From Swiss-Prot:
Top-rank EC class of the record's enzyme: transferase
Family statement: Belongs to the protein kinase superfamily. Ser/Thr protein kinase family.
Phosphothreonine modified-residue sites: 499, 504
Lineage: Eukaryota, Viridiplantae, Streptophyta, Embryophyta, Tracheophyta
Function of the molecule: Probable receptor-like serine/threonine-protein kinase involved in abscisic acid (ABA) signaling. Acts as a positive regulator of abiotic stress response.
Regions of this protein lying in the Extracellular compartment: 27-264
InterPro entries the UniProt entry points to: Kinase-like_dom_sf, Prot_kinase_dom, Protein_kinase_ATP_BS, Ser-Thr/Tyr_kinase_cat_dom, Ser/Thr_kinase_AS, WAK_assoc_C, WAK_GUB
Residues reported in the UniProt entry to bind ATP: 347-355, 369
EC number(s) per entry: 2.7.11.1
Stated name of the protein: LEAF RUST 10 DISEASE-RESISTANCE LOCUS RECEPTOR-LIKE PROTEIN KINASE-like 1.2
GO cellular component: a single term: plasma membrane
One Pfam family it belongs to: WAK_assoc
PANTHER family: LEAF RUST 10 DISEASE-RESISTANCE LOCUS RECEPTOR-LIKE PROTEIN KINASE-LIKE 1.2, LEAF RUST 10 DISEASE-RESISTANCE LOCUS RECEPTOR-LIKE PROTEIN KINASE-LIKE 1.4
């Protein structure tokens, strides 16, 4: 290769990314000003809310102005003389949970004002009951009222303060109560009936808070067109990277059509430049490896892959280090365990090899992966799985028992055997049985899978092939996440790595597919597809469905935004008959919607996803999610590839 070639490549790359950086720096100031913010904890704040001191007032409406609670690091909303701490925000239901700030900070909270929502865009969600607090009441007031005494107040022998839920009785005696007490304050409490708060104290009841809904212009079309919502003299505008639009999207009108044509031309030209650069780099690297391979020995690898192209890049010293501490099985031992790799013992196959059931001499049941002879990447995949799994210990990750020796005829990996098949088998495969997989079990599977992925990301590992076929289940439906052949160890100081898209159709992150940038948010997107599988029992890709529903992720987004989630929920889950199931399914769907955003920066991290699912599992309510509008518009702009005309294995 000509010595000047690397310099030419670096110069080309420099100019290409200089152009990209220039485009980024030219973003409209209002667009940049309305980037979502938070107070440190709790939900991120964006339209129709805005965070005073951190965002401009044109990022939301005046009635939605929030401040930060310095102690709790949560957003605060002022209504009718009281301050309310916002615990979470849900745009799926256009609602947010609030708690009176006195209940958050004061050991003896005493709200002094009735909640008045007249001339505000807010209204109390029906999921509440009214709690009336009676302050400083004379001792002769009916004893029946004294259900929840305010014991922390300065009661005397003549005056008492307490709360009551019995609105009917209080209604009859309202005049008596108003005459006998100095003040009556009505407080809504999140509960369907009094039995929900049975056994709680006065303070615990107030700390439950309540849910408010709001009305505001839809932001969905603006978000999915790449914009951010805001206001101009209290009128809705879509704030786009190139300037505000008076309509609700960044892609409307003749000028936008012309701009899209220009963008397509620029993208095409950029793609050509990148393609040329990539081809040159590939040729250069290939030439270097080819030259180096003559100097390297392939003795470490099994004899029948010494001519394997991937073997030439398989670092011998690192491979020897890799096998330290890993149990080495002989080929004969595994051949006997699998009855000479009997086809009847096949458990499944993937892009790299076939998995067989085996039984070792010590009685252990194992799963043996035999990598395909004709797959030139098998040595790389072999090393990848060994390198990753030997350093991991988590109850929801499949365990690697060992591998074949360097003198083995084949590359073999030995895993713990997980007896109950895959999640895909139970949802829409040969083991599908609605009665065996109720919603509580599905939610448990979601929590455990998220826990495993959170652990991987904390270990700087991206799975890159999260799907229901790679989620194994034992007899108690405990999760074991498997198949790390595509996984990547992530550099500690990087937010993404550039690599050719790999994965399974229907699960691949569209941002990764479009930009060739792999990040941990790619796993978040794939996991969201699994969440929708758990809700619907439908496969990620099905070419027999209508065109717009072939891809489950696209189908889910459309159904949620059109308030048609019920249409895709598995009827066996009891969505229409069980209130808790309905609440938790909606909360999980909302979380999945957030994770399916085409822009990876709008997705939560896996730690947030796992924490949210745990909260949903424990108390049935939603999460501290970013605000996302799902009211009026079409599907997200990008979606995971769903083409199955040409077989696309996980490679």
């Amino acid at each position: 290769m000509n010595p000047s070639t690397p310099s030419l490549l670096y110069t080309s790359i420099f100019f290409y990314f200089t152009i990209i950086a220039t485009q980024t720096l030219s973003l409209d100031p209002k667009f940049k000003a309305c980037e979502p913010k938070s107070c440190g904890k709790g939900p991120q704040i964006s339209y129709p809310f805005y965070l005073s001191g951190k965002q401009e007032s044109f990022c939301g409406y005046p009635s939605f102005e929030l401040t930060c609670d310095d102690e709790e690091k949560l957003p605060v909303l002022g209504i009718s003389g009281e301050e309310y701490v916002i615990k979470n925000i849900s745009y799926l239901t256009q609602s947010f949970q609030v708690v009176n700030s006195k209940a958050s900070h004061d050991p003896c909270p005493r709200p002094l004002n009735n909640l008045t929502l007249h001339r505000t865009p807010f209204f109390v969600n029906p999921s509440h009951i009214n709690f009336t607090i009676l302050y400083n009441c004379s001792d002769h007031l009916l004893e029946d009222f004294r259900t929840y005494p305010l014991t922390c107040a300065r009661n005397t022998s003549l005056l008492r303060s307490f709360g009551v839920f019995d609105r009917k009785k209080l209604g009859k005696e309202k005049q008596i109560a108003s005459m006998s007490c100095q003040k009556l304050v009505d407080v809504p409490v999140l509960a369907s009936n009094e039995s929900d708060v049975m056994g709680m104290t006065y303070v615990e009841i107030l700390k439950r808070g309540f849910v408010l809904n709001w009305t505001a212009n839809s932001c969905f079309r603006c978000i999915t067109s790449g914009g951010r919502c805001g206001t101009d003299q209290q009128e809705f505008v879509c704030l786009c990277p190139d300037g505000p639009k008076l309509h609700d999207t960044c892609t409307n009108g003749k000028n936008d059509k012309r701009r899209r044509v220009i963008v397509k031309v620029l993208i095409g030209a950029s793609a050509a430049v990148v393609g040329l650069i990539a081809a040159s780099i590939f040729w250069y690297v290939y030439h270097r490896r080819k030259t180096k391979s003559y100097r390297n020995s392939s003795a470490l690898l099994p004899r029948n892959i010494s001519s394997d192209p991937s073997a030439k890049s398989f670092d011998i010293e690192k491979a020897e280090e890799l096998l330290v501490g890993v149990h080495i099985f002989s080929y004969e031992e595994l051949e006997e365990a699998t009855n000479n790799f009997d086809p009847s013992k096949e458990l499944g196959d993937g892009g790299f090899g076939t998995v067989y059931y085996g039984k070792l001499k010590d009685g252990r049941s194992v799963a043996v992966k035999r990598l395909y002879d004709n797959n030139f990447k098998r040595a790389e995949q072999f090393r990848n799985e060994v390198e990753i799994l030997t350093g991991l210990r988590h109850p929801n990750l499949v365990a690697l028992f060992g591998c074949s020796s360097k003198q083995s005829r084949d590359l073999l990996l030995v895993y713990e055997y997980v007896a109950n098949g895959t999640l895909a088998d139970h949802l829409h495969g040969p083991q599908a049985n609605p009665s065996s997989l109720p919603w509580s079990i599905r939610l448990k599977i979601a929590v455990e899978t998220a826990s495993a992925l959170k652990y991987l990301h904390a270990s700087k590992i991206i799975h890159r092939d999260v799907k229901s076929n790679n989620i194994l289940l034992d007899q108690n439906f405990n999760v074991k996440v498997a198949d790390f052949g595509l996984s990547r160890l992530f550099p500690m100081d990087k937010t993404h790595v550039s690599t050719a898209p790999q994965g399974t159709p229907g699960y691949v992150d569209p941002d990764y597919h479009l930009c060739y940038q792999l990040s941990n948010k790619s796993d978040v997107y794939s996991f969201a597809v699994v969440l929708m599988e758990l809700i619907s029992s439908l496969p990620a890709v099905d070419i027999t469905r209508p065109r717009q529903e072939i891809n489950l992720s696209n189908m889910a987004v459309v159904k949620i935004q059109n308030h048609e989630l019920r249409d895709m929920v598995d009827p066996s889950l009891g969505f229409d008959t069980d209130t808790r199931v309905r609440q938790t399914v909606i909360a999980v769907a909302e979380l999945a919607f957030q994770c399916l955003q085409s822009d990876k920066d709008l997705r939560p991290c896996m730690s947030h996803v796992q924490d949210t699912l745990t909260r949903i599992q424990n108390n049935g309510f939603g999460s501290e999610m970013d605000v996302v509008d799902v009211n009026k518009s079409g599907p997200l702009v990008a979606q995971s590839p769903d083409s199955v005309i040409v077989k696309w294995d996980s490679k």
